[in-house]
Amino acid sequence: MNRIFGRKKKDKDSDEKGSTESENDFLSSLPAKANKRYSMAYSSLQPDGNNSTNSKSADKFDDKGKAVDTPEFFVNTINLLPNIEILAQLCSSLQSKPSAWSKSLIDCNGIEALLNVLAFIERNGQKDSDVILQSLAVTCLLSLLNSKYGIEKAIATPNSMIRLITSMDTPKADTRSSVFEILTAICMISEKGYQLILEAMTHFKQVRKERFRFTFLVESMKKVMNSSDKEYLTTCLTLVNGIVNSSEEIDERIQLRTEFTRLGLDEVISVNKNIPYEEAPDLLTQIDVYEDEQRADQEELSERFEDLDIDINDPQVIFNEIYKQAKDRLHHPLLAILQSLLSISSDTEVGMLSWFLIEKLVLQISVNKPMIGDDDGKVSLEDLLASTAPSVALQSEFQKNIEELAKVKDQLKKANFDLNIANQELSSRSHESSVLKSNMFNTVKQKDQEIIKLRGQMKRIDSNFFSPPGGDGDDHINVINTPEESSPHHESPRKQQQQTSKPPLNPKSSKPPISSSQLKEKSKSNLSSSSSDSLSNDFKSQVEVAQQQQPQQQNIESTLTPEPTQIIKEEPIVTTPPPAPPAPPPPPMMGGGPPPPPPPPMMGGGGPPPPPPPPMMGGGPPPPPPMGGKGGPPPPPGGGGFGLFNSNKPPANAPKFTVSKPTTKVKQFQWTKIPNKKLGETIFTNLGTIKTDWLNVGEIENLFFAPEANSQKKLEASDKKSTSSTKPGTVSVIDPKKSQNLAIYLSKFKCPLEEIKTALYTLDEDIFTMESLKALEQYLPTDEDMEAIKDYLKKDGELKMLTKAEHFLLEMDSVSSLAERVKSFYLKILFPDKLKEIKPDLELFTKTIKDIKNSKNFLKVMEVVLIIGNFLNGGTARGDCFGFKLDALLKLADTKTANNKSNLLVYIISELEQKFPDSLKFMDDLSGVQECVKISMNTISADLNLLKKDLDAVNNGIGKMKRSKEESYFFSTMDDFIKDANIEIKIAFDQFQEAEKNFQELAVLFGEESKIPSEEFFVTINRFIVMFDKCYKDFQRDKEAAERAIKRDEAKAKKAQQLKRMNGKIASSTNNKNPLASSSTSVGDGGMVEDIMQSVRDGDAFKQRRRLKGTKENTDDSSSITTISEQSENSNTSSITITTPSGIELDITPSKSGSRREKKTSKSSDKDKEKEKEKEKQCESTESEDINKKDINVAAKALTIVMRSKQTMHSRIDTFNFDA
């Protein structure tokens, strides 16, 4: 690094004469305020005759004028009034004064004073005028820190790295570059300084309110990554390498590299990776260092898991391996960890910081560090959270507040919910009261109308009543009573049981016939009592079941309608035959007006029974014929008759029980009924007669009622309907799960069910796809489905009330040979697609076999392996080999070199490239092998056989189907398909047999068994190709890196020669002019930062650190730096040997000019050396004379240059020429 603000020494005589004048000129040129403070600082340093320090000052300095040039003067002035003039003069002094002067400035807290200037600028807000002041302060620090002593003092200064890193935020790129150089040197020299830099980066992130600590660094690189000037980019990437590679822990290095990758560093590298080496050699060197170190860390990390044989870069593979290890004993801890990770959000700032914190914790644990931090200072979790972000430290308290607020919110929500429920309940009860009031008046009105109708009916019965001889009336009454006895709708279960358990009637036990007058009187008395009793009881019933909201007319009809459920079978009633046939009952109505309603049931159970209800259109059983004599007239047509019921008649051993219907609408229990014809095989036949008197009907209705939200208008409209309002909108009688799945399946069709049915006849592929046909096979109607639907329809069920699923099953059931049609249709669609999958595989398989057989390049590779292998195995049992199996190719990488840095595969690649370059094209010749790995001949054979089997089954199924003219299109289409499919399947079988034959020949050709699985054979070749390709790319990369290393070393040797010649000139001139400064121009081990930066730029520093890693853990910090410096000095050698990361050693010969120069130097005679020395002395004397001629006032010149730099803010201040 060139010295900046260099100040040239004056002659001794001129210096003595002009010291006072220069001092006075300097002070007079300053502003009044500044002049006063300078005078104060100067007066405090004036020698005093009575002071004992006068002699020391006189010994140290030539005269009292030099007091303004003392370290104390500069430190006091900078602390009192930092300004551009004083810092410019300090820069000049640091370049011209001896190392003892610089050390004295450091001891006077000069570094802290300069850092305070940076802090002052940052604290007061950076202004335009502060840019130059900041640049000068950083330049002075760069000079003071150019030694180990200065760096140690800076590290010991509190908050030094924070104040230094804060100065990165400046518009001047040169200032940032100087800061980056200082930080890089500290990272490489001191472990403590390295940790302070990372902490300062975190603080800088918080000040700028950025999410990541390296955001500013990477973003500044992105801004210039496409520019032609690569110097700044090189300095930044040098700092990145210093930060990443200075850690001794591989896990921390990987973590830091991951942070930079997240911020987009890889993008910057990729943009500048392929530029010509001559344009930016140092930048390309840094890129190589970054990638080489990254690759080395990955290899070192892979060694940890080499026994697992997994890809450590695949998260899914790693998770599967972790789960495999932890699933037995560590299942619960792993599950708890995963559940906790799942609850952490990645969208918020706290969530992101939590993830990074977890990553850091796991890394610390993985390297056996149970505590966070080093042994000297353990960090608690709270402190670590606080260092990660201030907001995270308050997260615990914040979370408690959130939980408390959440509880209050839940309580408020619960109170609002209860309030809404109370309001709804109040509104509902108000509505119920209005409905009850309305129903009460309607009921009273309805009962009055019923009384009038019943009185009219009594009159009709009275006028039509007659008493035939022999007790015909009694026979008629028995006929009337039969339906009532079989309809226990309004009787208790116990009473029903008692009625059904009564013995059958016989002639001896039958009651005497009732006379006409007795029946009339009894009817009148019962009518009056039943009317009043039923009116009051029905009104009470209406109040109790107000939520039912049913029309009264339907309640009466349900009272009269017999229960369709199973009724205990009674023995036929036998009575004495009457002397004359009775009159037939009134004929039933065929859909005319409704019959006159019967009187309501009486509480006591007495009174005459109601007349039988008219048969519905669904076809109920006719009333039983009169006892004795011939039966009554047959049921009217359309009634259905007994045949339909006998088809689903329960077996004799079916369980017997009686259950009444609910009086309100209740929720249904979704079960699947066992068909009656299969009931005899179940355990239900063992139940016998079941008692139901324990059934609490009212409790069940109250618990499972289904409330309706119908309006009053809808209720009034429902009064006019003859159907029961307890029925839901739709009815499903099949398995609920199947009904739901079928509804989902049918929703995919955008056409009516009739079109779906027609598509099965017309083979319409616009409606049916392969997937829908495959699913249809699962939803074909079964016997149970159709039996359930038919049972519903036979029991007066309405077809339109069934769901779409039942309608679909009915449509499908009407299709002839449904299963065969669906299977044929499915195969017709599947067959071409399946062949399209098989044929290309067979063609690729056959082509790849031919490529392997005909590849001369692959044969050459096998030949080279055979020759080298025979040489290595010569004289052993493995020698004299004339052929080897393919798996030997996978073992090439296992044969390591003597230094274990390379292997036999790398050597073979190098031999092939040098001697048989065309053979490297074998990977292109065998490009189809990668796809053949996925092809299994066994799978293809199974698929072809399955297609053939399905085709034969479809052919046989269609042959058994009845052909009709209406289905001519279906049969003709399927006949053509079967004919073409047989031809195609035969061609496919021929191709398969040919491919199988060729593969067997290929397997034998490579020494394998003919029955080896094809996928195993091609996997071996493919693994070799992948391994060869990766190794070849690494070899190419190493070769390019070696070529760049040659150019770099040539440039390094040339620079070393120039530097050596320049140092000789400067040393000679300095010794002649000022013996005090002959030792060094900086502190002690001066030039350390320069040497380190040069070594870092050349890439030698990182190689040396990796080479010494783990071998010198307790050595001094400067040991590696000393080695680096020694290596940089001895870098000029006649030949260079470079070992690539792959282990190949390359001998590098310098360029002709360099070798010629070295050769000339080594063979030069003593006379030539003397002549060269004389020439150098002449050059030095000439330069010193020029310097003396150009001697000027440095402080005034610095001020002038600074003023100019304000106009060009982005010019480097260390490139200013004071001698201009």
Curated annotation (Swiss-Prot):
It holds the Pfam family Drf_FH3. Residues 1-62, 461-659, 711-732, 1049-1192 are annotated as: Disordered. Residues 575-638 have a biased composition (Pro residues). Residues 1083-1158 form the DAD domain. InterPro entries: ARM-like (IPR011989), ARM-type_fold (IPR016024), FH2_Formin (IPR015425), FH2_Formin_sf (IPR042201), FH3_dom (IPR010472), Formin_Homology (IPR051425), GBD/FH3_dom (IPR014768), GTPase-bd (IPR010473). One of its GO terms (biological process) is actin filament polymerization. One of its GO terms (molecular function) is small GTPase binding. Residues 1-10 have a biased composition (Basic residues). Residues 501-518, 525-554, 1117-1142 have a biased composition (Low complexity). Residues 392-428, 1032-1062 form a coiled coil. Keywords: Actin-binding, Coiled coil. Residues 41-56, 555-564, 1066-1083 have a biased composition (Polar residues). It comes from the Eukaryota. Residues 6-373 form the GBD/FH3 domain. Residues 656-1054 form the FH2 domain. Residues 532-655 form the FH1 domain. Belongs to the formin homology family. Diaphanous subfamily. The DAD domain regulates activation via by an autoinhibitory interaction with the GBD/FH3 domain. This autoinhibition is released upon competitive binding of an activated GTPase. The release of DAD allows the FH2 domain to then nucleate and elongate nonbranched actin filaments. Interacts (via GBD/FH3 domain) with activated Rho-GTPases. This is Formin-F.
